[in-house]
Amino acid sequence: MITSVPALQSASSGAVLSTARQSGPKDSSPSAQSNVAPQEAPAAPLIEAWVVSEPYAGLQAQGLGLAEAAAFRPIMQPLQPRFPWRYLAARFWPQPLAALPEETMAAALPPVVVGCGGAGAVVVAALRKRGSAAVQVQHPRIDIRRFDVVLAARHDGLSGPNVVVTRTALHRVTPARLADAAARWAGKLSHLQRPLVAVLVGGDSGRYRFGRREAAKLAHELAAMMEADRVGLALTPSRRTGSEEQALLRQVLEPRGGWIWDGTGENPYFGLLALADVIVVTIDSVSMVSEAVATSAPVMLARLPGHSARQHVFMQALINEGRVREFKGRLDHWPVEPIDDTAEAAAETRRRLGL
C-alpha cells in the first residue's frame, strides 16, 4: 500500500509528459517453492527513461525497479562528476549536467528522467528544465517542487502535493524474476538441507559497522542455528563485505555445510530470495531488507553496531507490523505476507505523468 496525495495540478517546465515531449529536443526446484509476491505490471508501450544515479548498486536497483515496473525502457546513466566537484555535495554543483558523460548530453533527451539519491536529484532537476518529465526516487534533499513526482519511503518523513510515500524502498524483485531465478538455482542448491535459510550480508557503512568482530559473531550465531535447528544455509555477501570478513564467514560456516557465494559466476541473489524458507539480512541496508520482505519468506534482522534514526524507523515499522523479527541465533518461522509497493508506486507515477 502506498500513501499518495492529489495528482499534480501544475508545475513549471516538464510538469506532465505531454509538456515534456513538446518542449524537448525533436531528435529525440521441484522440492522448492519460489517466494513470489503478487504484482501486476502496466501493459503499455515502452517509453525511454534515463535512470540517473551515482554508481551504487542499491541506488541503481531502486531506479531500475521503478522504471521497469512502470513499463519504461530504462537506460542507466551513472554520474561521473569531475574533480573537484565529486568532493562537494551535489546541491552545490555549479553545473550539474557536467556530471553526465559528454556523449549522453549530445543525445536527444528522453521523455522521462528518473533520479536516485541526492546527486541524481540535482541532475534530474536540471534535465527537467530542458523538457524531460522528472521523477525522483528517495528524498531529493532539494526543493521537491523541482520534480513532477517524488517517490519517498515513509521513513524519509517527506510530504507534499507531488510526493508518493511507500513502505519500503523500491526494487527489482518481481514474480517473474523470482520464478526464473528459482528455476535456475533450485538444482544448484538442492544439496542443501531444508528448511533453507538465505543470509544476505552487507558491510561497513557510514552508520553501521561490520568488521571482523561482527562477522565472527554472525558466523557463530548462524553455525549454532545450523546445528540446533538442522537447517541448510546459503549466504551471499555484498560489494561492501570485506575480504577478511568473507574469509571468516567461510571458515566457520563451510565446514558445517554452509554454502557461500565466492563472487564468481552468476550472482545467486535472486535465487536465494526465491528459494529461501527464511531469510536473515543484516540491518545496514534498507534496500536488502526491502527486497527480502517483498518475498513470501519470514525475514530476520541481524543487528550491527551503529545507529541511523531513519533506518531505525524503517526497521521498527516492519517489526511492529510483524513482517520481520530480530535474529537471535535460532530459526524462527511465522506466517507473513509480502510487502511490496513498487508496482503500485509505478502505476501512480504513470498516472501523474499522464500516461
Residue ranges: model-predicted function:
Residues 145-211, 327, 333-339, 343:
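A nucleotide-sugar donor-handling region in carbohydrate enzymes
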Residues 204-237:
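Conserved catalytic-core segment of nucleotide-activated headgroup transferases in glycan assembly
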Residues 45-50:
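Extreme N-terminal starter segment of soluble prokaryotic enzymes
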Residues 316-355:
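Leloir-type glycosyltransferase catalytic cores
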Residues 250-287:
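Donor nucleotide-activated moiety binding/catalytic core segment of transferases
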Residues 239-253:
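Short, structured helix-loop element that forms part of the nucleotide-activated donor/catalytic region
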Residues 296-303:
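Structural loop-to-beta junction motif characteristic of Rossmann-like glycosyltransferase folds
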Residues 51-165, 171:
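Active-site and donor-binding regions of nucleotide-sugar-utilizing enzymes
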